[in-house]
Amino acid sequence: MIREFKSNPLNYNDIVFLGNSITESGKDWSKRLNYPNIKNRGIGGDVTDGVLARLDEIIYFKPKAIFLLIGINDLWNNNSPDNPSAEYIANNIIKISQVINAQTPKTKIYIQTVLPIEKEKFKNNILKVNEIIKANEKDNPYQTIDLYSIFVNENGLIKKELSTDGIHLNEKGYDTWVDFIKPVVSSIN
C-alpha cells in the first residue's frame, strides 16, 4: 500500500477516502466517482487507533474533504477483554474528526457508518457504534453518511449480493456505495 501511496501522492485540496480494506479495495476512487482529485488512503486491517496515528500525513495537505469508513476491524478483533468496546471505537472515530478539524478547519469531514457484516455476533456492536456517531454529529465537525442503511438486510446483516465474503464488498457493493455518495462528492467539487 505504501508504494501505491507514493505513486499517487496527496496534493493540496484533494478529496481523501480514508479507512481500512473496504476503502482500500475500492481502488481508484477518482475513476469510480469521475473526479481526478480523489485519493484512496485505505489500508487493509487498519483500526481507529491506526487512523489516528497516520492523520498528520493526510492533514498536512489540507484536504478539501475526507470520507472516513473505519471501525469494523476494531470490532472484529474484539475477541478478548483487552480489545476496545463499541463506545471506545465510536469515540475514536469522533476524535479523528476533531483532530482533523483542529488542524484544517476548512476540510469537510464525512463519517460513513460502519457496514453490517454477515456475522450475527457483531450486529449489536455495529449498531451501537453507528448510533453513537449519529447521536454526536450535531456537536462535532462532521456529517454522517449512513452507509449501513443501504447495505443491511432484514436480519441486520450485510446483503449477500453486495459482498464477496460477508465483510468486503463486491463490484455491485462498490457501485451501490458510489451511487449513494456521488451527490455529496459532486457538491464538494
Predicted regions and their residues:
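Alpha-helical scaffolding within the catalytic cores
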Residues: G50-F61, P84, N91-V99
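Short glycine-enriched, charge-decorated loop/helix-capping segments at active-site entrances
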Residues: S80-A86, L162-T164
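Catalytic His-Asp segment of secreted/periplasmic serine-dependent ester chemistry enzymes
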Residues: P116-N189
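Structural recognition of the beta-strand scaffold that forms the well-ordered cores
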Residues: I15-F17, K39-G42, A65-I70, K108-T113, ...
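Cell-envelope and extracellular/periplasmic
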Residues: G42-D46, F67-P81, I94, V114, ...
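Active-site segments of SGNH/GDSL-like serine hydrolases
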Residues: L69-L75, Q98-K128
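Charged, glycine-enriched surface loops/patches
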Residues: E87-Q112, K134-Y142, D146
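Serine-esterase "nucleophile elbow" of acetyl-processing enzymes
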Residues: M1-A65
